[in-house]
């Protein structure tokens, strides 16, 4: 069946399926049945709907043929009325925990379509998705409903998938057609699905706890990929473009639930913003919702300020393309329920903050200092002004602060360099009032618009896209030379939540023309703080240092001053072509605080200092900015991470503890422009205040300098907020009462005084010739200081003893000594060059792959020892890793030692995320002031060897007891982008103590590592330049022939993902792609939670660049399921895989003992005498009852079972034999297996060597059972005896189940099917015995142990009532013996029904006639038949056709419950 094609279903199968009335009349035991009648229908859609009188005059060019979901009345004749606001969206489906959703679906369109939910419990015939899952054709009728046909989908909302404790009342998901994700979405087939907590919905389906709820879908429709193609790209909200979304209505003091969906068939991000409002999302206060295409979020908002407010995505291209609408808040007379009454003490803490800010035009130098280490190409492209480029200096407008309303005295005589281009920091806590007196000293209108606070229209300072000129008030656009006062109060609804940082990072900017104003430079950082977060001076109480880092992309081509800059800085202004791609690119400046390159100055912090970083992304950027912190981790939203993702026009607050000495790098992870422009170095230094100036301790100069290696200059500074604060009189009194003004009288804090300690530091600094260093040693400025680095176990020693500085054993020893009982884990890893095939199983089995799929790459490979001669062969647990390097596992407080050998042809290294390491083990090169001795780790030459030593601090591991392991990554850091695209990346798992065994494997955990990556071979070191895409191809957007969306480097067909139903499965998901590589992971049929955040339910997981996510899943549905990205174009091109969930009872005898496996299916390398392979059946009896062989030297005997189909093997039972009191048995053996009989795999399991040796028998009679974990899928199994007693001897049974699942016994043999549920046409009864129907149980013992009818004719039948609709996949039959009479059924047929009245025969697919099954050939053996297609029924009858002597039946049915 083609992936997106609809295979014709044979008529007999369709009749059989339609005859399964259980689907039609299926009764659901649910809290509530919620029924919907949905149709897919054609509709002409206008993205810019005009008023009726205008639409008659002209036909819009933006009318497109779409397929949309619409809701109908009972008979599908009348469409239900719908809200105009919903636009293209299908009806919102909703259900509470315990409910069942029944969707009656009819396809009125011209294409096969389906309905697939992102989150619900469903079975295979309600999935609505087409892929090779091993199900029968009739089970795929839901996959693609043909035009004119109908189908009924049944979805259950169970507690396992419902919102968790910390979730909002309703979680937002999408449903859509999954026949062809790209074309179906772009055609319009999508709607919202709300999964709600029990008791959260009213009778009409509306939420109880909100005044209003709205669903908004921010989407990009590519009409060229619609089923009805028409080239156009539309940026919309609910399908409305250019502000034509009907106004969203609300009343003041409403509590609104927002359900926001992002959708696009290509990678897309959205920064959803509601002007003048704040929202709460996942218990965090936000002003911008970060949304990813393919994912959804739920947020809530309490509104109080009346007016019409802009709703938009702040991604520049979205706003410019018309992705906006309006929220209209009216005064409906509702009482104020949002403002909390304050106590007297709280009222006294209220402050008034007054700022005097001007917009000024300046000449800005993006790179006042250009270090020699700056990339040459980057410098030529962005910083030099030859080739008629502007260069690094531009005329810009900036915000600057003044002392008073005269605007004559700036607060800083010299603007702080570390502040860069940023405006002054505006801080306020809840209930404080902020007044900004703004003077426009520039030459054109500007304003101030602040994110993160609720403001009135007078204080908004923003011009909307649809504002006519006459509506642009003074506050929206302050003319040159004019002054305007913005004033607002931080409301209770703006206050950071309990989970938030003390102060949360926001943004302010001019918004007369947001894009051009920001491009011109008018940006600044406000902070909104909790009630007690700020001192009276505006300093945050719970942080040693606050640091602002704004990652801004200034597109100077959109600046108001472009013409001025061309005239001033271009050598030949008249010849400049502004649309020249090279010229345009040279004017897009990637900066950190306005600096487009690294600087010679280094920011400095004290060892153990807690730094509160306020990180923001601003500017003309349509991609995520991943911020990487080397040597340390951010603590953000309760999670430690060393890459923090910033969405456009949004900010994050993160705490960093300075716990790793050295000079480190804060930079953007991603493109060349980002990594070169958005970067700064900082120094984590040890400064011992207690020892400073201690005259009693004399130190030799040599001792002082031994601890200092080429330190940078130091100016250490604690920032004060220059602001006029005007407390209320009562607040003033309280401040004095609390001693808040005492700092002014503290002589140690005075600028004019200089202590002897200061003088000593100045002396040392002058001796060392130190340069400037930004930090925070003192409360005020100290112009120079020295770094008196105290003795430290992992920083001081190596700098004193150069011989041990790079010795891995010495470094590891120091780590081990710092904490008792530390463990050292050693790995041997090499970089090797290989030919990698992105289609390893064969191109014929996949689609959408380019013609060339094999490329030279470099990969990490594990070895057994430091000789690097014997690779560590991967086993079943490593099968799924694909291109990934070996998993490096460790526990908290361990020391990891990796001996790295570079067997490739170019330099590579090892760089680890999340761990603690010295500079000599960083594996990454930048100007960190380290001596050459500490740079040997940066790049290991071909054939070179280096040992990296990493420490595992507690922050690297799980944060709570529910989290087992936490994932990170390692890769080569010589050139991270090119090295990773070349293939050099692997996972790191840090686990709780006691979770890892001596072989570095986790104990009793089912875990998988998945790396989502679009590999671009043109970015690989090994890609021939001659084969790269041409400029023309890139400009017209031709999909690269050399990109491969894949999971672990394998498109479509990643192997080895198998698990048991209801077991805890841990998935570690990695994304180390560039800023545009955004993936949304969806596991069909399952939901999951993020490790450490089990209070939040997830249906899909956005996986952002640099993200390492560990999630936990408890698979609830057996079968083969699809794992994919929700980004349609990547999914279609290969970013998908299958995972198999098998029943926990998958340990059934496969048929050696019962005889289901025939003699011809058993073979061996040889045998001795009459001990033939066919005798190797568990519990076989007789004189010759086993397989045996005499092992000769240099021979390796084996016995093989051909199962004639691929099955799941989970265990092996073995016996020896006894003959004439002589025991013969196998003591030890290993197993090999194959799917085709040609390619054999040795089972390795958890063994550290090449194969697992199973413990065999200890005598000739006892059965020894061995568990196969992980389970294997194979057709052929071989057992290889290695140790034995007397001779290698086997009697065997294999344990397992069918690959497709749904093959467990239904209860005839076990008694789960009750006697009363087994009936027959008649039964034989004599004076001494009764052969009643309930005796028809497989393997039943006794004198009367089967069913016999009263008479033997073709009208007899045996019937089983399964009590509910059941999927029956196979049957085993058995005869019986009475006295010496052998009785069995030789042929039979099957009938079934759901109502016990209308019976239907099981048909032969080939003939469409009643199928006659071959029965038994003796009275005790088993015969098994599979039903393909399976039977869906409650009642089943076995009708004997022919028999031996008399009719006698013992049976077992196999299958599973349907719902």
From Swiss-Prot:
Residue span(s) of domain F5/8 type C: 1146-1297, 1302-1456
InterPro entries assigned to the protein according to its UniProt record, in alphabetical order: Cu-oxidase-like_N (IPR011707), Cu_oxidase_CS (IPR033138), Cupredoxin (IPR008972), FA58C (IPR000421), Factor_5/8-like (IPR024715), Galactose-bd-like_sf (IPR008979), Neuropilin_MCO_CoagFactor (IPR050633)
Occurrences of domain F5/8 type A (ranges): 32-330, 351-685, 823-1142
Keyword Zinc-finger among record annotations: no
Molecular function terms from GO: copper ion binding; peptidase activator activity; signaling receptor activity; toxin activity
Entry PTM: In physiological conditions, blood coagulation factor V and factor Va are inactivated by activated protein C (APC) through proteolytic degradation of the heavy chain. However, oscutarin-C non-catalytic subunit (factor V-like protein) retains its full activity even at high concentration of APC. This has two explanations: this protein has only one of the three cleavage sites present in factor V that are targeted by the APC for inactivation, and the binding with the catalytic subunit protect the cleavage site from inactivation.
UniProt-annotated stretches for the region B: 693-817
Protein name: Venom prothrombin activator oscutarin-C non-catalytic subunit
